[in-house]
Amino acid sequence: SAIAQYLQGTGMSVSGSDRFFNEGKAGDIKEKLEAEGITCYLQDGSGITPQTDLVVASTAIEDTVIEIKKAKELGIPVIKRSALLALIAASKKTIAIGGTSGKSTTTAMLFDIMTYAGLSPSIISGAGLVSLIKKGKIGNAFVGSSEWLVIEADESDGSIVQYHPAIGILLNIEKDHKELDELMNIFETFRNNSSLFIVNQSNEHSKKLSVNLIND
């Protein structure tokens, strides 16, 4: 829901569906999305029309899902969520938070710090921020007025290598969704794609990717 809220907040017309809507679940999330102006459909293909410009799906959505099938029948482009986030990140001055753990917390902290500093950042996160939830929002996205964007960069599906942030922050590296060697390669690409790279040297694996030991 984070990217949907972000794009709606920038003035785009956004709609979407979820199988949980069919089952009568996720009612609170659905209400909050609709309060933002996002139209929510049942997962029955009714939200896909010839007027739809683009369909975005997460990596968990199969090609057999009716919305994907209908979009392809109508010749509507279909892209993955991670690819769209990479496009959004490329359009802003982006700070990408990476690491095996602590991403959501650090993303939230940095967003709040920048907000209090008057920098008016935007955010796309994997978890809700208390400061935004208190305002009645889902809390995982916000559109600020500046060029700054803070994102949580996920390594579990390898999508982190698509980002080319102004600032990349690496919190830690531990064996989790992938083997350690594969993670090291993924985060090395993340480092190489970042204009400025900040590493937490208290983690034995992440510090191996440090280029300048003095400044990290």
Identify the residue ranges that each predicted region occupies.
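ATP-dependent carboxylate-amine ligase
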Residues: 1-40, 51-55, 72-76, 211-214
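Phosphate-binding loop of NTP-binding sites
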Residues: 6-10, 47-50, 59-215
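Structural motif corresponding to alpha-helix initiation and N-cap regions
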Residues: 27, 42-45, 184
